[in-house]
């Protein structure tokens, strides 16, 4: 499909061998026509979503759109280095020790694992705290095969250790936040400085804090089962809103299934069984809205693969 441009404010970051479905491109073009949208960027993993595309970033002025962030605020990747030796890896033993981690953690269990509980967050009783969730969310142990730039890695990084990658989201909190705002205001943008915008931003921040805690709890319960510990090397959201500056203009950057390229180390996961890449973005890129792909993309809707 190539690194082509439609109007000057629409960019798709892809080469001639990248397959992107037509519906996703159509959604991107439609979204670019919303009032106050200045620029949009589609990533190589661009695909169609529920009305708005996934794998894209949108930059607007004076207004922002909760619907562009979607119903899983704060979904993202967290990466831990464990104390487990890669050379001594015994998958069957680790799987047996891990057992079932689909049951929500009680407040006592949360306190025992982290010394923190999710009770201060809205709807915390309904959020299945400490669980990964469905869809394409996962937690997986990884081994390091190749280090290309050791000088760019944290000093404590040890390629002889097993690494844990957790991909999880808001466990229903983002859905409840989005539903309330859509019921009250529809899909139109919220004016910055308005009461509606302030309410959403406060709830958005609470969701970001919750998902960070939840990913820590997921890792902590896994480490507890394996009788080991780990150090978090990064925790980066790919569904979120922030006020920032692009090309000298201050506005609102919406990322939906899109990894920030201006926050240090990030993980780009591959398809199941394929390689994932720990990368450090090295330069400011206005065309991509300082954003990278958040995964390998997909050719089919999840429902078609069941």
Give the label of every model feature segment.
Residues 80-85, 205:
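Short histidine-centered catalytic/ligand-binding loop motif
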Residues 109-115:
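Long, basic N-terminal domains or extensions that often function
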Residues 2-27, 35-41, 48-54, 58, ...:
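Domain-length cofactor-binding catalytic modules of enzymes
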């Amino acid at each position: 499909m190539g690194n082509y441009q439609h109007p000057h404010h629409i960019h798709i970051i892809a080469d001639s061998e990248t397959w992107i479905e037509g519906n996703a491109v159509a959604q991107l073009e439609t979204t670019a026509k919303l009032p106050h949208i200045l620029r949009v960027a589609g990533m190589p993993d661009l695909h169609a979503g529920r009305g708005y595309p996934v794998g894209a970033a949108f930059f607007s002025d004076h207004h922002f759109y909760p619907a562009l962030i979607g119903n899983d605020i704060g979904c993202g990747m967290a990466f831990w280095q464990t104390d487990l030796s890669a050379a001594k890896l015994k998958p069957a033993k680790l799987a047996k020790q891990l057992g079932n981690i689909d049951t929500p953690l009680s407040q006592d269990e949360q306190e025992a694992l982290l010394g923190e509980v999710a009770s201060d967050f809205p709807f915390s009783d309904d959020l299945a705290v400490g669980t990964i969730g469905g869809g394409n969310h996962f937690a997986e142990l990884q081994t390091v095969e190749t280090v290309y730039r050791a000088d760019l890695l944290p000093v404590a990084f040890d390629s002889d250790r097993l690494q844990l990658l957790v991909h999880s989201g808001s466990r229903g909190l983002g859905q409840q936040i989005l539903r309330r705002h859509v019921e009250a205001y529809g899909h139109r943008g919220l004016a910055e400085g308005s009461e509606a915008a302030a309410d959403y931003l406060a709830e958005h921040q609470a969701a970001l804090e919750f998902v960070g805690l939840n990913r820590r709890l997921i890792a902590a319960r896994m480490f507890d089962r394996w009788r080991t510990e780990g150090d978090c090397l990064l925790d980066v959201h790919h569904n979120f809103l922030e006020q920032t500056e692009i090309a000298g203009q201050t506005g609102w950057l919406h990322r939906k299934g899109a990894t920030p390229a201006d926050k240090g180390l990030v993980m780009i996961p591959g398809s199941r069984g394929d390689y994932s890449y720990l990368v450090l973005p090295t330069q400011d890129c206005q065309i991509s809205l300082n954003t990278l792909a958040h995964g390998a993309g997909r050719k089919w809707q999840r429902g078609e693969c069941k």
